[in-house]
Regions:
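C-terminal helical "tail/cap" subdomain of flavin- and related membrane-associated enzymes
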Residues: 3-10, 71, 78-80, 88-102, ...
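Residues at the starts of beta-strands that form the adenosine-phosphate
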Residues: 8, 32, 247
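Conserved mid-domain beta->alpha element of the FAD-binding
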Residues: 11-28, 36, 175-176, 206, ...
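Conserved Rossmann-like nucleotide-cofactor binding loop
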Residues: 17, 41, 181
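Catalytic P-loop NTPase motifs of RecA-like helicase/translocase cores
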Residues: 42-43, 183-184, 322-324
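Active-site-adjacent segment of FAD-dependent monooxygenases/related oxidoreductases
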Residues: 45-136, 383
């Protein structure tokens, strides 16, 4: 066990949020850190992750070498004139009735381009990002094969972590970065709390990759090589270039009130996928036909927690505010969390300060991150013609400024306020 008279921190979970936090603490503080990861090595599932301008700025603030390495491997729109565009939004299917079609609800109709501010947006392969993070961390920082079972908060004597393999570890505090199925969250909130476990959002998706040359042949260069969003009744599709422009990534979403399965991901057949999009326009149908075998990914989020901490236990990233992907900002919020918490912890001089530091972090992040969960669910309804209906003028108006509050955030102002409050509370 680690001696209790030394200030040291455990991070549970070696995903994007956990490793960004570990790098922050390595760069900003002298606090020893141990990362406990359930898997035999660092790694991430899922094809890609989106970072908006706010997240790109946070990555640069955490580590310029990380930003340079990730930036070299990031994917963006391939047309130079589209570098400032987040997504081009289009109608993906014909209107449900003659009135809708007369108003322009026709497959292929261009709605608008949503532009983003500098430093732009990145699409990054999750495993590439984790690889780059791991390279910048001391190799002896991680403990693998550690599945957390319990945390005992002993107050001034620290916390004791118990793992499935029977081992224990004592630290000054623990930060749970263990994702949407977070064991740390259930310990903090209690297993019976409705907010302790993931909630199905009424949406699911198929994911796949299409060779870029085939996509260009069917869609043309502009639509294949740049980020596109196709909207429709109870569904939408996103496409964007990955693998240095050699492939087009596809995420195809559908609405469904029920998810009767125990698992979040289940196998799907090509026939199921084609049936789900049978009444869509030619572009979307052609894309689905090009996709290979795909699983079905149910989309869950977390109901609001009253706080992201309890005593010497803190939550970060998806463990505190997992959201749907409809605004492309969930992973970015985890990076923001890591930067904010790292900056607050640089002012901690003794273990007794940690609960107050966690409280300051929770207050700084709660409103913004919960707003993401709520507005991301709303965005799913908007894209699926379930919020403004198929009124494309209202949808365009909603899109115009929808992302500004996410992208234009000055985190340093929140950090300054949090540190001031933390100092007063000590």
């Amino acid at each position: 066990m680690v001696p209790t008279d030394d200030l040291n921190i455990a991070i549970v979970g070696g995903g994007i949020g956990g490793l960004c936090l570990a790098l922050c603490l390595e760069n900003f503080t002298s606090i020893p850190v141990t990362v406990y990861e359930n898997a035999p090595q660092f790694g991430e599932i899922g094809a890609g992750v989106a970072f908006g301008p706010n997240a790109v700025r946070a990555i640069k603030q955490i580590s310029e070498p990380l930003a340079a390495a990730v930036g070299r491997r990031a994917n963006m729109n391939m047309f130079p004139e589209k570098k400032g565009v987040w997504f081009d939004f289009r109608v993906g299917m014909d209107g449900a009735n003659e009135s809708a079609r007369a108003r322009g609800v026709l497959a292929g109709t261009f709605l608008c381009s949503v532009e983003h501010p500098e430093p732009g947006s990145w699409m990054v392969n999750r495993s590439h990002l984790v690889d780059e993070l791991a390279k910048l961390l001391p190799p002896d920082m991680a403990r693998f094969g550690k599945n957390l079972i319990d945390i005992e908060d002993l107050g001034s004597e620290g916390v004791v972590l118990t793992f499935e393999d029977g081992t224990t570890a004592r630290h000054s505090a623990v930060i749970g970065c263990d994702g949407i199925k977070s064991r740390t969250r259930r310990i903090v909130l209690g297993d019976e709390n409705p907010a302790a476990n993931p909630a199905y959002t009424g949406k699911y998706c198929y994911r796949g990759l299409v060779p870029m040359d085939k996509a260009v042949e069917l869609l043309g260069e502009e639509k294949a090589m740049n980020c596109q969003a196709y909207l429709g009744y109870h569904g939408h599709m996103l496409t964007f270039p990955v693998a240095g422009g050699r492939m087009m990534n596809v995420v195809a979403f559908q609405s469904s009130n029920d998810w009767p399965h125990d698992k979040m991901v289940i196998p799907a057949t090509k026939e199921q996928m084609l049936s789900s999009f049978s009444d869509w326009g030619p572009d979307v149908l052609n894309i689905v036909r090009l996709m290979g075998q795909s699983d079905i990914w149910a989309l869950f989020d977390l109901l609001p927690a009253e706080a992201y901490h309890k005593g010497r236990v803190c939550l970060l990233g998806d463990a505190s505010h997992a959201s749907t992907p409809f605004q492309g900002a969930g992973a970015g919020m985890a990076v923001e969390d890591a930067y904010v918490l790292g900056c607050i912890l640089r002012h901690v001089k003794q273990a007794a300060d940690l609960p107050s530091a966690f409280e300051a972090f929770s207050k700084a992040r709660l409103e913004r991150t919960q707003k993401l969960v709520t507005t991301s669910r709303e965005a799913g309804h908007l894209w699926h013609f379930e919020m403004e209906g198929d009124d494309i003028e209202k949808i365009k108006e909603n899109l115009k400024d929808r992302m500004n509050w996410i992208w234009n955030k000055n985190l340093d102002e929140d950090i300054e306020e949090a540190v001031a409050g933390f100092g007063e509370g000590k």
